[in-house]
Amino acid sequence: KCCKKGGPRKCPPEGMTXFYERIFRI
């Protein structure tokens, strides 16, 4: 799930995926 769709290379912390999706638009 890391780097998917050209998103950030870092993996979001557990339970923070959605949070990262909103910020980085993964």
Swiss-Prot record:
Post-translational modification: Glycosylated.
Main location: secreted
GO BP: any one term: defense response to bacterium
Tissue: Produced by the opercular gland in the gill cavity and secreted as part of the mucus cocoon.
Domain of life, source organism: Eukaryota
GO CC field: extracellular region
Keyword Secreted annotated: yes
Keywords: Antibiotic, Antimicrobial, Glycoprotein, Secreted
Subcellular location(s) per record: Secreted
Function: Exhibits antibacterial activity. May play a role in protection against parasite settlement.
Identification of the protein by name: Mucus envelope protein
